[in-house]
Structure formats: structure tokens, C-alpha cells
């Protein structure tokens, strides 16, 4: 928390020429920078986990059961929630759960497959590569937006620290 003290000191020096700026307002500015960094990093972590789940779905998109009675891989879906963080007095993004998609499996006629039932049908995962690809692009763009936001917050912190010199 020495970082917060330094930022508060810099803001105090920076705003010392402005009589109408209070210490509380300076503290809010320092806390806002910390909150921005925490919000961005939580978003990056959440999107990173989302990309991991998507990549697992893609990697297992053709994994069938070994026998007719065994189900194939089931697509996983990640869910998020905003969680209050009292340290920064705001909400951050967290993974609330990862659940299996309960939609139907794809059936293909492959009578010679070891997992074929008595009709020759094989159950394939309920993974749609197009959906996973679109989701991964969205997750990557959201991750990149959080990186940009984090870089801006760090740049602002560095500018404040430069003012102390």
C-alpha cells in the first residue's frame, strides 16, 4: 500500500496549486487508478479462463465415447459475475461457474465405429466449431481491451510518479 501513499503524495503536490481540491478528492484519484488496474486485471483473468475453456471445447470437438453407452465430450460454458471488492470499493469480474452444455449431441451414421449403437449411430460432442471460433475472437478482443485499459492506467500512474521527481 506504499504505492497508494506515493500516489496520494504526488496528487497532493500536483493539486497543491488548486485551493479548491481537497485531500479527499486527491485520495479518490489515487483509489481510482488502483481500481482501474484491478478491474482491468480481473477482466483479463476472466477472459483468459474463457479462452482456456473454449480451447478445450475445440480440442475435444471430435472426442466420442469409447462404447455405445459412453457419452462423448460435452461442451463447457463459462459464466461470470460481478463481485464486490471492498479494497477498491467497486465490483470486479470473476468466474462464477463452468457448466456443461446440456444440448443434444450430434448423431452420425458410422456403423463400424466402436461407439456405434445398434442402429450404427455414433454420438459426437455438442461442440460447434463456428460458435467456439466466434466466442474466442470475442474473448480475445475483450482481453485486448482490458490490456489497453490497464496500460492507460499504468501510464497515468507513471505520469503521477514522474511529477514527484
Model segments located where?
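N-terminal secretory signal peptides that target proteins for export/translocation
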Residues: 1-2
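Bacterial N-terminal signal peptides
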Residues: 5-19
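Amphipathic alpha-helical polymerization modules
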Residues: 18-165
Amino acid at each position: 500500500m506504499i504505492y497508494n501513499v506515493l500516489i496520494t503524495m504526488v496528487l497532493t503536490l500536483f493539486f497543491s496549486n488548486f485551493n479548491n481540491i481537497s485531500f479527499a478528492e486527491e485520495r479518490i484519484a489515487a483509489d481510482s487508478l488502483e481500481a482501474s488496474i484491478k478491474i482491468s486485471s480481473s477482466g483479463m483473468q476472466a477472459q483468459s479462463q474463457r479462452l482456456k475453456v473454449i480451447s478445450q471445447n475445440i480440442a475435444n470437438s471430435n472426442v466420442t465415447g469409447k462404447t455405445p453407452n459412453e457419452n462423448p465430450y460435452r461442451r463447457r460454458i463459462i459464466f461470470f459475475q460481478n463481485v464486490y471488492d471492498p479494497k477498491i470499493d467497486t465490483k470486479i469480474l470473476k468466474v462464477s461457474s463452468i457448466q456443461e452444455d446440456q444440448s443434444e449431441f450430434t448423431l452420425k451414421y458410422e456403423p463400424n465405429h466402436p461407439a456405434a449403437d445398434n442402429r450404427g449411430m455414433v454420438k459426437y460432442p455438442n461442440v460447434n466449431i463456428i460458435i467456439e471460433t466466434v466466442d474466442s475472437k470475442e474473448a480475445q478482443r475483450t482481453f485486448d481491451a482490458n490490456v489497453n485499459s490497464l496500460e492507460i492506467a499504468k501510464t497515468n500512474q507513471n505520469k503521477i510518479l514522474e511529477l514527484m521527481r
